[in-house]
Curated annotation (Swiss-Prot):
Its main location: cytoplasm. The gene is citD. Belongs to the CitD family. The modification O-(phosphoribosyl dephospho-coenzyme A)serine is found at S14. This is Citrate lyase acyl carrier protein. Keywords: Cytoplasm, Phosphoprotein. It is found in: Cytoplasm. Oligomer with a subunit composition of (alpha,beta,gamma)6.
Length: 97
């Protein structure tokens, strides 16, 4: 899946996460995480983001995660929504989600 535009999903409210995804000039996933629980859960957040992007077939993107203590299911949903928006996909492949 190719990222065509910058897109975001989520809010900066408590227990939520804002995910921004856009096209990258360099190959690979460029990931920046800012989280109130980064010291405890930073590695887990990174793993969830990378797994979710891999499931969607995203190989090249700039990703910024601004986490306010979101649950894993919320993080996964926000990453999916932002990636689909950035790819400008209108036809969802539900089996990938």
């Amino acid at each position: 899946m190719e990222m065509k535009i910058d897109a975001l999903a989520g809010t900066l409210e408590s227990s939520d996460v804002m995910v921004r995804i856009g096209p990258a000039a360099q190959p690979g996933i460029q990931l920046e995480i800012d989280s109130i629980v980064k010291q405890q859960f930073g590695a887990a957040i990174e793993q969830v983001v990378r797994e979710t992007l891999a499931q969607l077939g995203v190989k090249q993107a700039n990703v910024v995660v601004d986490d306010k203590g979101a649950l894993e299911c919320v993080l996964r949903a926000r990453v999916q929504a932002a990636a689909l928006r950035a790819a400008q996909q209108t036809q969802l492949q539900w089996s990938q989600l």
